[in-house]
Regions:
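Short, Gly/Pro- and small/polar-rich lid/capping loops
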Residues: 462-474
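Short, hydrophobic/aromatic-rich segments at coil-to-beta transitions
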Residues: 473-477, 543
Length: 543
């Protein structure tokens, strides 16, 4: 690297897969425009380089525009069209689970590697409604180097912490971060003499940092930067030999490679550090609740995906069922596509959600099919010869031992009672909760080790279960072996007594549901809620 100060200019065309338009419009118009508009610039400007994120969009290019896709691959080989962002979809990073974020990265970079022989090393989220504290930890564990956004300038809850620095995650792992690159929807008319750039370079001198990062491009419908912006950057590059500031037409993640490979440990240690979340005041608050059914189904997809994966791996390890990687991956990708930052937050037009909700249901069914097939294979290989009645296998898919109620449907019971016994012959608490002409539904308490299975024995009986229970419920009082909970006439929780701690009273005052003040938003009425109002204590229920 030279000793000159450097301006990394990154050309981009931000594309909202959905927003105030639907998926079909993106495929038929915006994906196509992104390809052909950039091809024109490549032909005319030899120094022009372009960065575009999201392997999902590349899959759409490959499927719907195969000839243009092949042409794009040649530009990727030349290093002029750059894949970036590492992910399958340019998604929200607060609502998805950590596993979903890891899968997003896995699918994204795996596709880039398979199709282009490339991998990006950045989380590239120009437009997203806040960034949780776990994100740098996840990115670091995914072997990524950097994070880029311009969104903090919109209204970060903590301001913009620095231009370029280190973002430390909850577990102490760090990535580099560029969080003040200016708006991606921007046409460059000046660089070396631009006050914004000069101020950033001067500020960065405090950290012995001789570089900065600047966006130029277009959004939110894809396409390409304005030609006059591309022409201006090329003219600025031509002045590099006579200037003390070097202008680079850069890929989105080049700056992170350069810092990581060329800085000494002492230089890296001098970079400013942000050790907190980076949440937004704008959009983020309402985006956590708007169109809540989609968030519920997304969570259910994540839960079913984890459960199906573990059951499938167990069955495969035991050699009793083949691991169906293709079906599981397809189901994951289908709903991760809807973790896009204008989809799952609930900020898109209504017709978008007809597709996303349908896709959630399809993925849930696929995961459920894999879970049922794997669990059935496991059940057929369990030892059940100790059972005197109907064997019931209970599977615990989480990482800790679990004691919880289980429901099961049994046929051929008629009007008889059912009693349930564990594999040691001990009767456990159970009851019949429903009867139909075809089945009897029972409920019992199962205790299963982490990621384990256990067989219970359901026996037809003339008498019901007589195992004692510590649970008692009255109109305003609930008690079990650990707690006594009392409600007041208003429905508030008046008292919680911990029986195991000498009847310690946990509450200092009754707990009631808080009511948040919401005056609406004229600009973004479907999702915007006031950040400062939501930080306040909610008003109590009227007495």
């Amino acid at each position: 690297m030279s000793n000159k100060k450097k301006i990394y200019t990154v050309a981009t065309a931000h594309l909202d897969t959905v927003w105030s338009w639907d998926f079909e419009t993106t495929v038929s118009k915006y994906i196509y425009n992104t390809l052909v508009d950039n091809f024109k610039l490549f032909k005319k400007y030899p120094t022009y380089t372009f960065s575009f994120e999201g392997s999902y969009r590349y899959e759409l290019m490959e499927e719907y525009y195969p000839e243009l896709f092949d042409k794009m691959k040649e530009y990727i080989k030349e290093g002029r069209w750059n894949v970036c962002g590492s992910s399958f979809e340019n998604g929200d990073v607060n609502i998805p689970s950590p596993e979903a974020l890891f899968r997003n990265i896995l699918f994204g970079n795996s596709y880039f590697d398979k199709k282009f022989g490339k991998r990006s090393v950045d989380i590239y989220l120009p437009d997203c409604f806040g960034f949780g504290w776990a994100l740098p930890s996840i990115a670091s564990h995914a072997n990524l180097l950097g994070f880029t956004t311009q969104k903090l300038a919109w209204g970060s809850a903590y301001g913009v912490p620095f231009d370029i620095g280190r973002w430390r995650g909850v577990d102490g792992n760090e990535i580099y971060a560029s969080v003040n690159p200016h708006d991606y929807y921007f046409t460059l008319k000046k660089l070396r003499d631009w006050d914004f750039v000069q101020n950033k370079l001067k500020e960065n001198e405090k950290y012995d940092l001789d570089m900065t990062y600047i966006f130029h491009g277009i959004g939110d419908r894809g396409g390409a930067p304005k030609e006059k912006s591309v022409k201006f950057v090329e003219e600025e590059i031509s002045k590099n030999n006579s200037s003390d500031i070097e202008v680079l037409a850069s890929s989105a993640d080049r700056i992170y490679h350069d810092i990581d490979e060329n800085f000494t440990p002492e230089q890296k240690a001098k970079l400013p550090v942000w050790n907190n979340e980076l949440v937004m005041k704008d959009h983020a608050v309402g985006g956590y609740t708007s169109r809540a059914v989609g968030k519920r189904w997304n969570r259910r997809c994540q839960e079913l995906a984890d459960i199906a994966e573990r059951a499938s791996v167990t069955a495969s390890y035991l050699g009793i069922k083949e691991y169906n990687k293709s079906a599981i991956d397809i189901a994951w990708k289908r709903f991760i596509a809807h973790q896009f930052h204008d989809d799952i937050p609930g900020t898109s037009c209504q017709r978008v959600y007809k597709r996303s909700w349908n896709d959630y249901a399809v993925s849930m069914n696929q995961f459920a099919n894999e879970l049922e097939a794997s669990a059935s294979a496991l059940a057929l290989n369990m030892k059940t010869d100790f059972c005197k009645g109907t064997p019931i296998m209970v599977y615990n898919p989480i990482e800790s031992q679990r004691q919880q109620t289980v429901t099961a449907r049994l046929s051929g019971i008629g009007n008889k009672n059912v009693r349930v016994f564990d594999d040691d012959g001990n009767e456990i608490k159970s009851q019949v909760i429903n009867r139909t002409n075809t089945y009897t539904e029972i409920l019992f308490i199962a205790d299963v080790k982490s990621l384990g299975t256990r067989i219970y024995d359901a026996r037809v009986s003339d008498i019901p279960c007589n195992a004692e229970s510590a649970v008692s419920i009255s109109k305003n009082r609930m008690e079990n072996q650990k707690y006594i909970v009392t409600l007041n006439p208003n429905g508030d929780i008046e008292s919680i007594i911990d029986k195991e701690q000498n009847n310690f009273q946990i509450l200092k005052e009754p707990v009631s549901l808080g009511l948040l003040k919401y005056n609406g938003s004229r600009v973004w009425p479907a999702w915007e809620m006031n950040y400062n109002e939501n930080k306040k204590c909610g008003r109590q229920n009227p007495r």
